[in-house]
Regions:
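Transmembrane-helix bundle of Major Facilitator Superfamily
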Residues: 2-188, 345, 349, 353, ...
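Transmembrane core module of solute transporters
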Residues: 13-62, 252-260, 278-407, 415-417
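Short helix-loop-helix connector
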Residues: 100, 116, 132-133, 289-290, ...
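A gly/Pro-rich, aromatic-decorated transmembrane alpha-helix motif that marks the paired
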Residues: 146, 150-166, 214, 218, ...
Length: 493
């Protein structure tokens, strides 16, 4: 006897949630692991810290510039298909990242890995939202957020153990067997979404959007530590021994006027806006942003939330290891207080969030996050470990109040056929915020440091670093306060 349709749908929604969460777990796990092994990568490749950090930055740039495009592409051609494709690309990128013999190879394969991660992340929340009825979406999204932050919490500790015992390359190889096991499961368990065959891809808009964001992020990342007139990039040699010692440049140098990249970013942005208003099926529906106040505000609050706090774990990690001389493994477990707090509190938020509007929860989360950043701005060389842990826990509580209600309100404010696009736009704001946060944090701290810190083995001034760290957290506090007001003025429907 066949099962009633209601039972089938009930089983499918939970199966979907489990399968999507397990597959999506790999991307944030990788992000958390890689952030911890950057010093080892710099040491092995004999490259400067300012270059090695691009192993993380370039990953975020790809996510930022392509998530919206991939969201529209998945709306047109099917979300399940490109969720599976994304998992496959992520596995391939992970394998070759582990095989990299130069920093150039690693950066190239991190781009490939990030393309796969973008396809996974842009479709995950849309697939979950499609599977659940409106009254259960907050709970489903809270579980999804819990899984993501469980991965982030696991990443640093797992990365520290793997690096210490079997080497940093294995943090990339870890994704390969897990991904290969998941591929047939995802393919067989998920249903394909309805396809919007009457829509076309906006490739021109994608190009100008990616160009504008890339120019902006490069300018912020490199500009403050360079001269007041130009950004100077020196490339002695880039080669790929894996592919027969192919040489791209030899003793090549380029000097970019400091104002050129921001100006190019503005020009590309203006062209992008013009293109989007004329496009039949734009990747960024500016009309939807202008007509849907809830959709606009949820995107803006996400941008301000992640810009304000995302650099905290990276900055505190360096503080613990360089200033307090704490072992990397111990530091990793200390840092896990933040994501573990999100894991513990997110389920409770999802269960009781029906009693409070997403507007109030988002604003409260931003406010609590702002308090934690204000506390961190008082950090000194002699601050107790308890002070740091309490600050991270408060930040985790703030993010848990924000992380599920905000995307749920965002995706519920659009029609089903636009949910991958909406999730892509929200993901773009999230990753743009993360990229800006890292760039602002590194630039602020860099202004307080001498030049030799950017070289492997360079010395560091304790007072200079902590002074820059405090200023970076205070800037984050100001950004969070602005985000509170944006959250409060939005509508609930």
């Amino acid at each position: 006897m066949s099962k009633p349709l209601s039972n089938y749908l009930s089983e499918y929604k939970w199966t979907t949630l489990i399968v999507v969460n397990i597959a999506t777990f790999l991307a944030p796990l990788d992000t958390g692991i890689v952030a911890l092994v950057l010093p080892n990568i710099a040491r092995d490749f004999q490259t400067g810290i300012d270059i090695a950090i691009w192993v993380s930055v370039i990953y975020l740039i790809v996510l930022t510039t392509f998530m919206t495009s991939f969201g529209r592409f998945s709306d047109i051609h099917g979300r399940k298909k490109y969720f599976v494709v994304g998992l496959g690309i992520f596995v391939i990128g992970s394998f070759f990242s582990g095989m990299s013999q130069t920093i150039a190879e690693l950066l190239i394969f991190r781009i490939i890995q990030a393309i796969g991660a973008a396809l996974l992340l842009v479709n995950s929340r849309a697939i979950i939202t499609d599977a659940f009825p409106p009254e259960e979406r907050r709970l489903a999204m809270s579980i999804h957020v819990t899984v993501i932050y469980l991965a982030i919490a696991t990443g640093p500790a797992l990365g520290a153990v793997i690096t210490e015992y079997i080497g940093w390359r294995n943090v990339f190889f870890l994704n390969v067997p897990l991904g290969l096991v998941l591929l047939p499961i995802v393919s067989s368990k998920l249903k394909e979404s309805a396809k919007s065959l009457n829509k076309s891809m906006d490739w021109l808009g994608s190009f100008f959007f990616a160009s504008s964001l890339s120019c902006l992020l490069i300018a912020i990342t490199f500009g403050p530590k360079e001269s007041l007139t130009s950004i100077d990039l020196y490339i002695e040699e880039i080669f790929l021994p894996m592919f027969g010692n192919i040489h791209f440049w030899s003793r090549f140098a380029i000097s970019i006027p400091l104002l050129l990249l921001p100006l190019l970013s503005l020009v590309f942005l203006i062209i992008f806006v013009i293109v989007e208003y004329k496009a039949k099926n734009p990747i960024l529906d500016l009309r939807m942003l202008s007509k849907n106040r809830l959709f606009l505000s949820t995107n803006l609050t996400a941008l301000f939330m992640y810009t304000s706090h995302y650099n905290a774990l990276v900055m505190i990690s360096f503080y613990l290891q360089l200033i307090r001389l704490i072992d990397p493994t111990e530091a990793a477990f200390m840092l896990s207080a933040f994501p573990l707090t999100v894991v513990v509190t997110s389920i409770a938020v999802g269960k009781y969030s029906k009693l409070v509007s997403s507007r109030e929860l988002s604003a409260l989360g931003m406010a609590i996050g702002a308090i934690s950043l204000l506390l961190m701005s008082r950090l000194t060389v002699t601050s107790s470990v308890l002070f740091i842990e309490v600050s991270l826990i408060i930040m985790g509580i703030g993010l848990s109040l924000f992380a599920a209600p905000n995307p749920n309100a965002n995706l519920s404010s659009v029609t089903s056929e636009d949910r991958s696009l909406a999730n892509g736009m929200l993901g773009t704001m999230r990753h743009l915020g993360q990229s800006l946060s890292l760039a602002i944090g590194a630039s602020t701290v860099g202004l307080f440091l001498s030049e030799d810190i950017y070289s492997v083995g360079g010395s560091i001034s304790v007072v200079e670093y902590v002074g820059g760290l405090s200023q970076a957290f205070f800037i984050g506090f100001i950004i969070a306060v602005i985000g509170i007001f944006i959250a409060l003025i939005r509508g609930n429907k």
